[in-house]
């Protein structure tokens, strides 16, 4: 079973990825993990990726694609995998097709976890952290007993810059713009399966299982 998992930040992709790889016994292959492994193993592509990352530059497609090619050729990916964080562009999606074609296989499905932007905003901007002990709260899902104060030590709660509304909205807008052409690409190929990510976590996974039952 060869899968790509998609979803905007806050959609619950990580939770579903854990459940998919556990149930179907396939490796969870994320871009970050691939880069780290290639650099740790000191491969030629790993060295190239490191040089770009050390300079704060984006790793170019030719290096990323090469690392993906090496990873998907490994034994544990022969019977299936869950790709997470790749592809990010139509060009990368086309290269993924070439890689899988060279390996004598193809993608089975692309699962996209859909969540309305307003819901994502609530999920992502609700996090508050205690300045004293670092305990994390969420104003909707795990609120403190007294607003603005930590349950454990009464410390002041603050919000990280990454969790502030303006930052989150900008991040979501960038992601939505990047993702749309990719969703259209896979939709045209009949590979795309959209799932309602606003349901309970268990119900989201039930929908995932229904899709994967046909493979």
Swiss-Prot record:
What are the start and end residues of every segment in region (NMP)? 30-59
- The primary location reported for this protein is cytoplasm
Which keywords, in A-to-Z order, does the entry hold? Answer: ATP-binding, Cytoplasm, Kinase, Metal-binding, Nucleotide biosynthesis, Nucleotide-binding, Transferase, Zinc
Q: Does the keyword Transport apply?
A: no
One GO BP = AMP salvage
For the ligand (ATP), the binding residues are: 10-15, 127, 136-137, 199
Q: Where do the annotations place AMP binding?
A: 31, 36, 57-59, 85-88, 92, 160, 171
Q: Where in the cell is it found?
A: Cytoplasm
GO-annotated molecular function: adenylate kinase activity; ATP binding; zinc ion binding
Protein family per UniProt:
Belongs to the adenylate kinase family.
Protein name per Swiss-Prot or TrEMBL: Adenylate kinase
Tell me what organism the protein belongs to. Listeria monocytogenes serotype 4b (strain CLIP80459)
């Amino acid at each position: 079973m060869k899968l790509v998992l998609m979803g905007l930040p806050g959609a619950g992709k990580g939770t579903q990825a854990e459940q998919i790889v556990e149930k179907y016994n396939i490796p969870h292959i994320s871009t970050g993990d691939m880069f780290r492994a290639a650099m740790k193993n000191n491969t030629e592509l790993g060295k190239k990726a490191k040089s770009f990352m050390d300079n704060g530059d984006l790793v170019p497609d030719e290096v990323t694609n090469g690392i993906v090619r090496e990873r998907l050729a490994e034994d544990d990916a022969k019977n299936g995998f869950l790709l997470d964080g790749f592809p990010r562009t139509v060009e990368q999606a086309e290269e993924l097709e070439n890689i899988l074609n060279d390996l004598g296989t193809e993608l089975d499905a692309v699962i996209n976890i859909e969540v309305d932007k307003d819901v994502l905003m609530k999920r992502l901007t609700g996090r508050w952290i205690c300045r004293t002990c670092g305990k994390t709260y969420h104003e909707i899902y795990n609120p403190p007993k007294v607003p603005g104060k930590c349950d454990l030590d009464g410390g002041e709660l603050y919000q990280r810059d990454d969790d502030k509304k303006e930052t989150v909205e900008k991040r979501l807008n960038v992601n939505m713009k990047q993702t749309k052409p990719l969703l259209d690409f896979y939709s045209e190929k009949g590979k795309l399966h959209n799932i309602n990510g606003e349901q309970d976590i268990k119900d989201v996974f039930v929908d995932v299982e229904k899709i994967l039952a046909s493979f």
